Amino acid sequence: MRLIFMGSPDFSVPVLEALHAHHEVVCVYCQPPRPAGRGKKDRPTPVQTRAEELGLPVRYPTSLRTPEAQAEFAALGAEAAVVVAYGLILPQPILDAPERGCLNIHASLLPRWRGAAPIHRAILAGDEETGICIMQMEAGLDTGPVLMCEKTHIGPEETVQDLHDRLSDMGARLILGALGALDDLVPRPQPDAGVTYAEKIAKAEAGIDWTRPAAEIDRQIRGLSPFPGAWTLLNGERVKLLRCRLAEGQGAPGAVLPGLTIACGTGAVEITLAQREGKRPMEPEEFLRGFPLPEGSRAHTA
């Protein structure tokens, strides 16, 4: 099938690779290179980098609302467009241009967690399951009818990165199935009940309040790892907490217990991966060798 692929971050790359292996990708659309790193040099998106490695033509318009951009898109003569974490709103002329329309790969069980950060929000909310939906796109934000859906359990110690990687591979597999069965799939309108929105993650959500229950803090750490990274102050230094598990232990909220376990409002969490500023992530034993925490140390955010 002649396809246009539209995506930008790491999450989109396995999908691009799967489509390239099994279909004809006539063009790749992604976000333009942007300044990044200490030197603030323009850095291409992961999708642009991989597409160029595969020898695929790449476009990165800043808007698809101009008549010129829409004419260039339509001239590709694609049977369908596959969209995953692209980053631009698709106006109606773009949605209408491919013969079979535009198919979106969304990392949630729609209509729950429409929007920008469905993987983060599922973990933060304590959802026990999530999944991938293949959706026929329309003008609304993730409102289109669902063609195919697959569920997966969220593990008790899974981070955003863990779930991101699993769902990315699941999306690549599922879109191949959807394209192969497109003539037989029946679009299912999303129900009005159960709609929630996955707002973008704000940095203000990352500071840990140790008076909260351990279960909430556990979800906060896992649901913000690796970015932006839940953080606390230890010995006056900001430390990112990247992996954890619920643990036994009692103490005043924020009290550091043996083995980098920290007491919460109720219960405790054992930190299994932490990162000081300017350092690489470390497991507890190595972390404490270079950053000993005397008895009576407290974690806090202000």
From Swiss-Prot:
Residues that coordinate or bind (6S)-5,6,7,8-tetrahydrofolate: 108-111
Origin: domain of life: Bacteria
One CC-aspect GO term: cytosol
Keywords on record: Protein biosynthesis, Transferase
Biased amino acid composition, Basic and acidic residues: 276-288
Keyword Electron transport attached: no
E.C. numbers: 2.1.2.9
Region (Disordered): 276-302
Keyword Transferase carried by entry: yes
InterPro entries in alphabetical order: Fmt (IPR005794), Formyl_trans_C (IPR005793), Formyl_transf_N (IPR002376), Formyl_transf_N_sf (IPR036477), Formyl_transferase-like_C_sf (IPR011034), GART_AS (IPR001555), Met-tRNA-FMT_C (IPR044135), Met-tRNA-FMT_N (IPR041711)
Alphabetical list of PANTHER family matching this protein: METHIONYL-TRNA FORMYLTRANSFERASE, METHIONYL-TRNA FORMYLTRANSFERASE, MITOCHONDRIAL
Name of the molecule in the record: Methionyl-tRNA formyltransferase
Organism: Cereibacter sphaeroides (strain ATCC 17029 / ATH 2.4.9) (Rhodobacter sphaeroides)
